[in-house]
From Swiss-Prot:
It catalyses: N-(5-phospho-beta-D-ribosyl)anthranilate = 1-(2-carboxyphenylamino)-1-deoxy-D-ribulose 5-phosphate. Pathway: Amino-acid biosynthesis; L-tryptophan biosynthesis; L-tryptophan from chorismate: step 3/5. It is an enzyme of class 5 (isomerase). NCBIfam families: PRK01222.1-7. The gene is trpF. Its EC number is 5.3.1.24. This is N-(5'-phosphoribosyl)anthranilate isomerase.
Length: 199
């Protein structure tokens, strides 16, 4: 069964909706963005998340110190890193790691010490997709997430195309820039039950 990560949550109501609907991962964005939360805000929201739902912190080109502070203060289960990744960034972290990879047409998949890879559009969180034909996941060492422009209408096709470990959505479950609780529920329902969208 493909797992689901709902990313960019910043309110109690959205976290509760995602958890009750069956999300496997909840993502908190610590990088500058309209979805950014502070460590203190994330720590409060994390109290609403049961142990079987994993808490993910999202960072852009962080230092190891930043990661360790967030892991400690929020109780993160995973860190997801976009941008520059130092060679030793993921070594001996007290939690699992995800390295984000922008799919930009060159088909390059980096050698990574991360536990998981996440394939995203060139501009993460934009709602834009990438050309699925540009990504060959054959022979990958790590389980991988698919992100980038996913929504309730195309997520089943993405799962059929890639057979990923998990799918990741943020803007695809928003209306007017805010998390839409019905869209969160429908997205998870489609993933868990394989119901194709209308488009």
């Amino acid at each position: 069964m493909t797992k689901v990560k709902i990313c960019g949550l910043s309110t109690k109501e959205a976290v509760e909706t995602a958890v009750s609907a069956g999300a496997d991962y909840i993502g908190f964005v610590f990088a500058p963005s309209k979805r950014q939360v502070t460590l203190e805000e994330a720590a409060e929201l994390a109290k609403l998340i049961p142990a079987d739902v994993k808490k993910v912190g999202v960072f852009v080109s962080p230092s190891r110190v930043e990661l360790l502070e967030a892991i400690d203060k929020v109780g993160l289960d995973l860190v997801q890193v976009h941008g520059q990744v130092a060679a030793d960034l993921f070594e001996n972290l007290p939690c699992a790691s995800i390295q984000a990879v922008q799919v930009d047409g060159n088909g390059h998949v980096p050698n990574s010490q991360a536990d998981y890879l996440l394939f995203d559009a060139p501009v993460a969180g934009s709602g834009q997709s990438f050309d699925w034909g540009q990504l060959d996941t054959t022979g990958l060492a790590q389980p991988f997430f698919i992100a980038g422009g996913l929504n309730e209408d195309n997520v089943v096709k993405a799962i059929q195309h890639f057979t990923p470990y998990a799918v990741d959505v943020s803007s695809g479950v928003e209306t007017d820039g805010q998390k839409d609780h019905e869209k969160i529920r429908r997205f998870i329902e489609r993933v868990k039950h394989g119901i194709s969208g209308t488009k």
